[in-house]
Amino acid sequence: MVVHSLRLQDLIEEIRGAKTQAQEREVIQKECAQIRASFRDGDPLQRHRQLAKLLYVHMLGYPAHFGQMECLKLIASPRFTDKRVGYLGAMLLLDERHDSHLLITNSIKNDLSQGNQPVQGLALCTLSTMGSAEMCRDLAPEVEKLLLQPSPYVRKKAILTAVHMIRKDPELSGIFLPPCTKLLRERHHGIQLGTVTLITELCERNPAALRHFRKVVPQLVQILRTLVTTGYSTEHSISGVSDPFLQVQILRLLRILGRNHEESSETMNDLLAQVATNTDTSRNAGNAVLLETVLTIMAIHSAAGLRVLAVNILGRFLLNNDKNIRYVALTSLLQLVQSDHSAVQRHRSTVVECLQETDASLSRRALELSLALVNSSNVRAMMQELQAFLESCPPDLRADCASGILLAAERFAPSKRWHIDTILHVLTTAGAHVRDDAVANLTQLIGEAEELHTYSVRRLYSALAEDISQQPLVQVAAWCIGEYGDLLLEGNCEETEPFQVEEEDVLALLEKVLQSHMSLPATRGYAITALMKLSTRLRGDNNRIRQVVSIYGSCVDLELQQRAVEYNTLFQKYDHMRAAILEKMPLVERGDPHVKEGGKEKQTEAQPLEVTAPAPTEPQATKLLDLLDLLGDTSEPLSSGHAQHLPPQTPSPGEALIHLLDLPCTPPPPAPIPSVRVFEREGLQLDLSFMRPLETPALLLVTATTTNSSKEDVTHFVCQAAVPKSFQLQLQAPSGNTIPAQGGLPITQVFRILNPNQAPLRLKLRLTYNHSGQPVQEIFEVDNLPVETWQ
């Protein structure tokens, strides 16, 4: 009995009419059974109709793999209606990861060779969609012939198919290189767009092609100039802009050809200025062309005035009502802040206004750019804006904002008092979101500023009395009260509001910290130690302190219990030594000195900081990488691995004698740190070399050098690094993203790693790149670094 089969339109209506998912599955299962039966009967007139219904079922997410062989039969059919559905089914149902797709190679070859343009177009579309590297190598000669066909319809599709072939197998570049120059002379916009895309792909994957196509820069400039000066055309204009797609693609190609090549850059400078000044910005099409123009100007050797014009265009984008355009402007300015810092500074006020954006992505990008714009001349004004933003910013931005403010204050603080005030404000506003080393840095800073001890202890005492919920603030205040409690009681500070503090008030405040449920065990440890130190600084009876300390002798926290037992023993057995043991901490040399940009600035507050050479401003978002979950705890020392390390240099007896006499001595230059090869695969090698500046012992400069000895280029190379949480990592921009084959110019990238605790260093690296047409990703840990990198 013949079962009536639904038409495609009827099947769609019936599926859409299903009220439940179960009804939909029932309809589809019933129809799939009829489709299978029709395939078994082998009716050639119904095959393409049945496959069309099966493709619709596949689009809904239901299995349709049993139709793969029917696709092959339809492709081999001489009828165009069969081929059309067969090729569509092949693009949807066949996968280059399975060998079944290779069965259509011969059919595609035959269709490409015949003169039927619609059939050739179907074959080219299928090949460019799911053609594997093997298919591309077999069919490249046929596609090359079609590049010179008189029909623009076929040539457009052949050009785009060639782009796919080069992506799958870069070795095919030599086949498609010669026809490009001739194709570029075509006046058909579709052919021009495809040709520019093909040349771009060739230049990105083949250095020889890059050198070859630099000769056509004048031709590209002329094409773009014609587009800019041409009036309105109904065929090509979009929102009043003449073919913006072709303009954008030409600008991208010019950016590649002009990078690191002065002659090509000079050829396109005038044109870029013309595009930047004449493009209409009232519609998105014009904004897209302007953005590509700006990126091209900044990537090539352009004139200084042209670069300023590009930054001003981005500044106008910041005032646009479209949030997407503002986000693009902030992102582009963040990329340009390294090369044109002064030009970006002109738009600082507009960038700061973007901090108040309601969109989280915009405010985050504005925060990163604002932190990157901080320098010694604007640090006071910028810190006021950032501190105001910190008070009202969303919780997910508070940690980044607080960390960025602390880092900027560390580098550009105009005075120690200003630095202390800034950190105190951050701890008071967002103490729970600061880095782990903020407490240690502030205590060290206060310890160094002897003239600010009274000011600091009184400020911290007042802040602690108002709020004990911010744990970092409580820890710093407890430490400072313990060290300088005598100044709190006796000292007078003109820079703070006068108030009288009694011994009972100080002890009661520390007891409140100990009893608070919000206090962490570490905070209670600070408070107990502060009480012990106050026992030698206060003139009253110490019985109250002894009673409080003795309570924690039975604490469930082992650290607090041990500390309390030791302090009780100090009271009972070594009371005569207590004053000497609990005296003020000596000054500790800072491992990360203040770095500040050159230039004179008036110092109106206490103790100006020393001015040193500037460090490059980096986006703060890349400075702070919390990688605890990637590397785990790093408290234990790591194995040194297989690298050959040099022993540390021991001082000579004469040098030791000079140190004993406290005479000035110039330290000998440090021994060079041996480099380490951390990665090697298929001709790609990654070596790390190290340097520790004498003036900043806690800073390690790591230079990652990547070389390629294979026979094929490595493209789209990206190296990312991660460090444990106790370190601070700053990744500088790499020298490029393409490594030429057979020992070409390597890629170098510098990592700035700050290790204030001198902990054993280990890295986690992730490499992503394309090699032999295949994407590669490698993730590995490096734990064989020389001991000289941290000791």
From Swiss-Prot:
Main location class: Golgi
PROSITE patterns in the cross-refs: GAE
Keywords (A to Z) from UniProt: Cytoplasmic vesicle, Endosome, Golgi apparatus, Membrane, Protein transport, Transport
Listed GO biological process terms: intracellular protein transport; vesicle-mediated transport
Subcellular localization(s) per the UniProt record: Golgi apparatus membrane; Cytoplasmic vesicle membrane; Endosome membrane
Tissue spec. comment: Widely expressed.
Gene3D superfamilies (alphabetical): 2.60.40.1230, Leucine-rich Repeat Variant
Residue span, GAE domain: 671-786
Membrane topology designation: Peripheral membrane protein
Gene Ontology CC terms, in alphabetical order: AP-1 adaptor complex; endosome membrane; Golgi membrane; Golgi-associated vesicle; membrane; synapse; trans-Golgi network; transport vesicle
Pfam families in the record: Adaptin_N (PF01602), Alpha_adaptinC2 (PF02883)
PANTHER family: ADAPTIN, ALPHA/GAMMA/EPSILON (PTHR22780)
Subunit architecture: May interact with AP1S1/Sigma1A-adaptin and AP1S2/Sigma1B-adaptin. Probably does not interact with APB1. Interacts (via GAE domain) with RABEP1, NECAP1, CLINT1 and AFTPH/aftiphilin. Interacts with HBV major surface antigen L. Interacts with HBV core protein C in a ubiquitin-dependent manner. Binds ubiquitin.
Family: Belongs to the adaptor complexes large subunit family.
Protein purpose: May function in protein sorting in late endosomes or multivesucular bodies (MVBs). Involved in MVB-assisted maturation of hepatitis B virus (HBV).
Protein name: AP-1 complex subunit gamma-like 2
Source organism per UniProt: Mus musculus (Mouse)
Gene: Ap1g2
